[in-house]
Amino acid sequence: MNYRNITLIFLLSALFGCDKFAGVKVTETFNIENTYSELYVSNAINVVISDTAEEVKVTTGENLLPNVIIEEKDDILDIRLKDGTYFFNSTVNIELPVNPNLTKLTLSNASDIEGDVNAEELTINLRNASDAKLKGYVKKLTLNLKDASGIKKNIINNRYGLSCDECAVSMKDASDAYIHCDGTIRIVKLSGASDLHYTGNAEIILTGSTSSSSDIKHDVL
């Protein structure tokens, strides 16, 4: 084997074997006030909202853990990685207690969230291929989705799991949403091959632009 081949093998091993540098999986708990009303998640972090959780649990590689930031300031809980952090093929999973005060949820950079939500008003902002798989009831729901993000399909008793009385929708860039509504759905913007799927007997109100590549679909399950 010549020097060039040895060098190539070493480089490939370094590239595809980086995951070991994240270390073995460990779990650490964090105490927060849980009085925040806005939740921000970024850097491809996965969050689960659990009704059995009493504190924040972070599960990830032992070497990656010190780079996870959970910052509660004023009304905002910000979950992210330190700038410049990158571990190949590694994951950060976070379990959060249910927060009845939540009014805004913002995910970016391929982050995911799932769990129960119940609120009078809730704004969900998803961008950069982020996804939310939620169930529960929100009286007044606002959806702002872009960059191939989505409210994922979650079927409960022949209807989609995220239910609302009113919904304002703005979606673009091949984003999708699945909701249940028996009230009104106001379409502010729907473009770029984005689709809104809904169950229920909602009245659709068009107040903004809708492109021919996008669709509003009344699904019967």
Report each predicted region and the residues it spans:
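Intrinsically disordered, low-complexity terminal regions
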Residues: 1-221
